[in-house]
Amino acid sequence: ELIPSLLSGAGIVSMDQIDTSYEGTPQRFVTDPSIMQQGFGTNEPFVYENEISQWMKPVAFQYLHELGYSIYPEPITVREADVAAQADCLTKLVPILQRSQLDFLADPERTNALIVDLVDRYQTSWTYSAGAAEFSAQAQLDDGLVFDDPTSGVFGQIDGARIAETVATFVPVLKATGSLAADAVVDPETLYTTQFIDPSITAESVLGED
């Protein structure tokens, strides 16, 4: 309930508007479009407009980062104790990860085809069409979701001020919901390192200016 708690704490919604039983299908929204549903702005708008036969029209949406949910989503993490031991590997791996995301956005067709094929083969109940994949890659660019770190100009660089803001925003929420001990102390500086980042890799150099 982290996101609902954040939105409620900011006065955007009240907890009695929150339904945490969402099971991952569009049925809930289609039957009651007055609700606000959690999803991906790089996926659900396309799916509702093009693939949900009971809807087939645009939906309004807003990104949570515009409301204070300014995390680094799905970061690559390593246990602190393993950083030194795996330093040689990380020195080689991290620049590959930096560059691969940019290379994907520069030419997503081949990777998108592979993802769509794997989704179909594994049949995990997740669905993903070629149209949705194409929309997602383009939306990441059009909506300004992929960009160089504003402070350093490096792609993939962690901004310490942003981490500190995230900690300041979410630690009180985590404590209030019982997910974090009330006396817990979280030092933002201990949560990240830029040690293995290749500073020569930039979105501007690969994707060009907007």
Name every feature range the model reports, one short phrase each.
Residues 3-17, 84-88, 92:
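Hinge/capping helix and adjacent helix->loop/strand transition within the periplasmic-binding protein
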Residues 4-8, 49, 116, 171:
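Class I S-adenosyl-L-methionine
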Residues 7-21, 34, 54-61, 180:
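A local structural motif
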Residues 23-27, 32-125:
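Pocket-lining segment of extracytoplasmic ligand-binding domains
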Residues 46, 74-76, 81, 145, ...:
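Flexible, active-site-adjacent loop/turn segments at secondary-structure boundaries
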Residues 85-178:
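Secondary-structure end/capping motifs
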Residues 160-210:
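Conserved C-terminal helix/tail region of periplasmic/extracytoplasmic solute-binding proteins
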